[in-house]
């Protein structure tokens, strides 16, 4: 049955591809925009002022929040860290409350990050695993998730989209990493033993569309390829894909100094599994690091 889907962050890389996929499946997509709406497929909102069209939320079957400032920025900047947090938490809180106050209570697919888990070393991480650590992105992800809870408390179906880096040549991080690798500068981070979760764009889009259409899916979902490589394995696979060698390494101390608040994400390990999605019947097209890279580079 065709759905009415409202998306915040529809103009972003993930949001635009998700919108295209949903429309291809005959669903109607309305984008929340922070400017005057140009068509019936847009609706103006201002999350920082708590302004939105209640009728749009009431008329939705599914609301998706992918809004948020880029994670790429100056990791030593307090302004960057503040925008990173507020752009995610505020938009999620406003939409969760809007859903809670609506009569129909549409499903809420709330963006989140795998940083919620924190560093777990080699331990296999599923949706049942706990959050640990106190890194910037882990703290933000916890607040981000908490902001979505009012929707579930009011009885709405809530799916938390725990997303790792999405590998596609048109977007970070693969866009930058393939250029560096082509120059022969591919380098593992530290000793390269840390697990590095990822997903192809087509699987991320496919999984989120699957959750939008699934009438009973709820809870956290790890949207990642089923076989999580180490950083060294990823670096070698990318080098092979562009016919180069990966012989370099960035020392741990250099990453800690240069990456600032993002160093824990570069050096931490999350051996992630998409257990909840696979239990529901979603089948990944790209299951290994090699498949993710080949699809992302195509």
Where are the language model's segments positioned?
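Conserved Rossmann-fold NAD(P)-dependent oxidoreductase catalytic core, especially the SDR/UDP-sugar
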Residues: 92-134
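Mid/C-terminal beta-alpha module of Rossmann-like enzyme folds, strongest
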Residues: 211-261, 294-297
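Conserved beta-loop-beta element that borders a ligand/cofactor-binding pocket
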Residues: 112, 146-169
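Glycine/proline-rich active-site loop of Rossmann-fold NAD(P)-dependent oxidoreductases
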Residues: 142, 154-156, 167-176, 211-221
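Alpha-helical substrate-binding/gating segment
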Residues: 178-186, 194-228
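N-terminal Rossmann NAD(P)H-binding glycine-rich loop of SDR-like oxidoreductase domains
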Residues: 5-25
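C-terminal amphipathic/interface module of NAD(P)-dependent oxidoreductases
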Residues: 264-298
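NAD(P)H-binding glycine-rich loop region in Rossmannoid oxidoreductase-like domains
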Residues: 37, 41-91
């Amino acid at each position: 049955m065709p759905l009415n889907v409202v998306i915040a962050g529809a103009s972003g890389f993930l949001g635009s591809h998700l919108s295209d996929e949903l429309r291809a499946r005959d669903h109607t997509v309305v984008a929340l925009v922070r400017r005057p709406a140009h068509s019936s497929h847009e609706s103006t909102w201002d999350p920082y002022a708590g302004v939105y069209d209640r009728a749009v939320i009431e008329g939705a079957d599914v609301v998706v929040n992918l809004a948020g400032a880029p994670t790429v920025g100056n990791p030593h900047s307090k302004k960057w860290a503040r925008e990173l947090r507020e752009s995610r938490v505020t938009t999620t809180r406003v939409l969760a409350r809007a859903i809670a106050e609506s009569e129909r209570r549409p499903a809420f697919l709330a963006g989140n990050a795998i940083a919620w888990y924190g560093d777990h070393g080699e331990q296999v991480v599923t949706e049942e695993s706990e959050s640990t650590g106190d890194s910037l992105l882990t703290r933000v992800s916890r607040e981000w998730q908490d902001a979505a809870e009012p929707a579930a408390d009011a009885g709405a179906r809530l799916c938390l989209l725990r997303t790792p880096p999405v590998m596609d040549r048109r977007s970070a991080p693969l866009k930058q990493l393939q250029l560096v690798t082509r120059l022969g500068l591919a380098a593992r981070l530290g000793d390269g033993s840390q697990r590095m979760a990822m997903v192809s764009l087509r699987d991320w889009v496919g999984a989120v569309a699957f959750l939008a259409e699934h009438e009973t899916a709820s809870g956290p979902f790890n949207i990642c390829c089923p076989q999580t490589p180490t950083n060294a394995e990823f670096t070698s696979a990318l080098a092979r894909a562009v016919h180069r060698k990966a012989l370099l390494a960035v020392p741990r101390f250099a990453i800690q100094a240069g990456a600032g608040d993002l160093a824990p994400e570069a050096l931490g390990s999350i051996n992630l599994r998409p257990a909840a999605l696979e239990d529901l019947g979603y089948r990944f097209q790209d299951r290994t690091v090699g498949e993710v890279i080949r699809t992302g580079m195509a």
